[in-house]
């Protein structure tokens, strides 16, 4: 199973996080499948690769609670519902 979660980078006492798609069994600093974003909590900066995030969400990736809040604030889930079409 794949999750979208935060991977810690940066210096001591100055954390910066990458938002990555990673296997659920991997460690926090383990090998990721793809880097899909960036989050700096101190400067409150966020960069998201929305097409890559939508790709992983459509394939069944589960975001963690913190990543879910970041994506919700950026409006990614509204784009996800607009991209889904009903097949009859």
UniProtKB/Swiss-Prot annotation:
Its main location: plastid. One of its GO terms (molecular function) is structural constituent of ribosome. The keyword Hydrolase does not apply. NCBIfam families: S16. InterPro entries: Ribosomal_bS16, Ribosomal_bS16_CS, Ribosomal_bS16_dom_sf. GO terms for biological process: translation. Belongs to the bacterial ribosomal protein bS16 family. One of its GO terms (cellular component) is chloroplast. This is Small ribosomal subunit protein bS16c. Keywords: Chloroplast, Plastid, Ribonucleoprotein, Ribosomal protein. It is found in: Plastid, Chloroplast. The lineage of its organism: Eukaryota, Viridiplantae, Streptophyta, Embryophyta, Tracheophyta. SUPFAM superfamilies: Ribosomal protein S16. The gene is rps16.
């Amino acid at each position: 199973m794949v999750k979208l979660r935060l991977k810690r980078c940066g210096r001591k006492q100055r954390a910066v996080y990458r938002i990555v798609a990673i296997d659920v069994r991997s460690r926090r600093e383990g090998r990721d499948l793809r880097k899909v974003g960036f989050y700096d909590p101190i400067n409150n900066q966020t960069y998201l690769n929305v097409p890559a995030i939508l790709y992983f969400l459509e394939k069944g990736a589960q975001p963690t609670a913190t990543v879910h809040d970041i994506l919700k604030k950026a409006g990614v889930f509204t784009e996800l519902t607009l991209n889904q079409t009903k097949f009859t």
